[in-house]
Amino acid sequence: MSVGFITIDEHGDIYLDPDTPPVSNPNFIEEIHRNLRLTEKFGLLTEFHDEEYIVESFDHPLHIIAIEFKEKKIFLQTKQNTLFQADNSKWSVDEWDRFNGLTTSYSPFVLTEKAQAQLFNLADSYDDEGFVADNEYIATPPYYIDSPQIESPQYWVNVYQSEGNPGWNLNEAAEAFKDMLPRIKFPKSRILVLGCGEGHDAAFLARAGHLVTAVDFSKEALARGKEKYKDLTNLHFFESDIFQLPQDWNFSFDVVVEHTCFCAIPPDKRSDLVRLYRRMLHEEGQLLAVFFAMEKRSGPPFGSTEWEIRKRTEQGFHYLFWGRLRNSIPSRMGRELFVLAKKKKD
């Protein structure tokens, strides 16, 4: 089967082509919804008219507008009137107190405000940890699953040493940067690469003539990068926790690069990371980013939605470009979001 793309916007509307109106045929919607499934790489696929499609969903793909409790089961109705049953072991709540979860067919959903209000009205009781439906307690843990070990530099050293070539290490610059940098045509810039790993993105930018500072707190990754790219005199590797960068770096970079850092840190530090982007950039500075948009609660790498990424960045940045990449490497196809954004003035 050939592979195409289907887009689901922030309201849950489905598009076969972003330049045409959303799909309105109930049978088509039903088919697309029913065939939704998570891949092993935590992307989304569906089938429609015997063809397979990668699903690019701005938020969790199923937007639930109504719920029903019946015989210890919870039934969900999408805005297009497709009906699903919730997997009562897969509920969670995000940082913005939105309830979400998986259906019994393993499709991700999020409750609209209307549906969430209805849930509270129907529940026998509820507390900060969950709710009771038909005398059954349904836990709603935080969406992201805590992984405290990732805050230790030794954890990352161990991964590099045990795996040799960790899954995030492409041994080359990200396809997005190779594709987009010639189009953007930055003038010679001071660029900061956060969580640089072995420095492949940083080296690519340095070879394009920029003055690049690459930061990581894995000694192993930095040692590899320094050896591999020792010929680049305009590339400087710096060992540090990104949240402990020198104060005299503040407001001194033209561009901050994000690629596999946002997904690698504890998700409860993501807003701190966005503030760090802004702190490192001068008033006209820009964020050059590849984020992972995928349905993955554990990590690293932790997933995120475009909804979350926008929620965290919209107060601090003007978006110059925002879009999914369709020239990714196969293992990342449909899950990479390219963002170019300019720092908002205080």
Regions found by a protein language model. Name each.
Residues 148-249, 265-346:
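Class I (Rossmann-like) S-adenosyl-L-methionine-dependent methyltransferase catalytic domain
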Residues 1-148:
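Terminal leader/tail segments of proteins
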Residues 260, 264:
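Short catalytic micro-motifs in class I SAM-dependent methyltransferases
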Residues 257:
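A conserved beta-strand element that flanks and buttresses the S-adenosyl-L-methionine
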Residues 254:
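Conserved acidic residues
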